[in-house]
């Protein structure tokens, strides 16, 4: 269509943030200021540190006719009644199998339209649960990556209708099988092109890696309540606690 949409912030007359964009921008600014100060111990010429994000969008595809027969799906985006299917994800055969041709057609159409909008989608594959799939982009600056994810979810619904599908983005639409997570892979980089969480070839670079790793671990330890706050909604709480990633606790794993 001919509409021009652009992200904006929403604040009150007295300056309080009334949306999700303003707190994100403030958080990114705080990370930039703190990380730049630490960088000056190693690289005095660094002027800015950028937070990069690579999200993973998981989703279920359901045939439109089957979707229309389920009022719970229509009203809530998840099943509220019924019985578990005879076959779920016991053998992981969907995860390691080929993508159905009809789904591939949807994915290709989605990717073309996403790229036309500047969304750098890169991967497509099956997920663990039956009829569950995933797409993921190349890393971007975090603020832009969040905008692109919101835009992609809206685009997915429109493209799915063209192919006779309904997209389910609820965290746990079906009982007994995996739900859909939105994993956030993030990193910090400088305006001079240095990946701060990457190991280096010199002792100085490795010291920088250790320092930023320790700072990240300490941040998780001190502020785990704040990290949990934005994801503690009913849908996500319903999904977590089984064998899915991540678990229902905050943890740090160094690989």
Please tell me what each predicted stretch does.
Residues 1-169, 174-255:
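Glycine-rich, acidic/polar active-site loops that bind/position phosphate-bearing ligands
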